Amino acid sequence: MSELDQLRQEAEQLKNQIRDARKACADATLSQITANIDPVGRIQMRTRRTLRGHLAKIYAMHWGTDSRLLVSASQDGKLIIWDSYTTNKVHAIPLRSSWVMTCAYAPSGNYVACGGLDNICSIYNLKTREGNVRVSRELAGHTGYLSCCRFLDDNQIVTSSGDTTCALWDIETGQQTTTFAGHTGDVMSLSLAPDTRLFVSGACDASAKLWDVREGMCRQTFTGHESDINAICFFPNGNAFATGSDDATCRLFDLRADQELMVYSHDNIICGITSVAFSKSGRLLLAGYDDFNCNVWDALKADRAGVLAGHDNRVSCLGVTDDGMAVATGSWDSFLKIWN
């Protein structure tokens, strides 16, 4: 038996020990604890606005903190800032690379960011003195595509990449201040905790990891999915997070329990999940699917509470406003829809 085989065996044994230790701590299931809670009932949402203007597939969207403006990124090579109340375009920003995969709105509303197959995170200043929007920084350092980015503030942004790492950047200097390495597959998505001290990442190694922003350490690793994790989103209180995967399930993981609490799936759903988001209370989990629909799950009961149907192609991205009053879905059909 070679040394490598021995190490593999040891690693497998350790994994099993961890699994058994977690099981021993699980004194009850979420289903048992929520048995006496009333079901949510049927959730019916209507399309209130359709945002038309992109000429190709929409790949990403992100709400501003004002719950009114949102940014979207499309294969047409444009980043558009929309006013969701009026459906007007506030800015249409031509990109240097049209292969964009992610976009983000800074909490201050001063900046937006985007990136994709160019491996670069481009930061755009929306509040220049001249009134025009221009690139204020190009953050180059990843050796793979940029899959997701989120601002901590106007000078710090976290990115995830196909090079299996995440990174924290100082925007002013354009340098990576911390690299978060540990995944063994492309990192597809990240989500910041409400206090922004932690973030979670989901990757093509089918695992999710919890990271400490300041220390650059992986705090916890969560397994259970059987395929790539495409989307990840923190629970509003920061104690749990949801993931969406190509294995056709969404899952809820709890940081304190250190394990999976719930699986959201249905025999009729056989396609992958592209995006996930919680309602403001956390009671509903919204998930976008490859079959053109967005399913609304009762997060506590794992029942399907509703469906948002209206797109003619894959739902690629979705987001809930900070005030919890609206949901936006973006699709490969080139439209964004606002629901409530």
UniProtKB/Swiss-Prot annotation:
GO molecular function, one term: signaling receptor complex adaptor activity
Annotated WD repeat ranges: 53-83, 95-125, 141-170, 182-212, 224-254, 268-298, 310-340
SUPFAM superfamilies: WD40 repeat-like
Classification via Pfam families: WD40_Gbeta (PF25391)
Transmembrane residue ranges: none
One annotated GO biological process: posterior lateral line neuromast primordium migration
Recorded GO CC terms: cytoplasm; heterotrimeric G-protein complex
Lineage: superkingdom: Eukaryota
Keyword tags: Repeat, Transducer, WD repeat
Its biological purpose: Guanine nucleotide-binding proteins (G proteins) are involved as a modulator or transducer in various transmembrane signaling systems. The beta and gamma chains are required for the GTPase activity, for replacement of GDP by GTP, and for G protein-effector interaction.
Similarity annotation: Belongs to the WD repeat G protein beta family.
Quaternary context: G proteins are composed of 3 units, alpha, beta and gamma.
Record's protein name: Guanine nucleotide-binding protein G(I)/G(S)/G(T) subunit beta-1
Species: Danio rerio (Zebrafish)
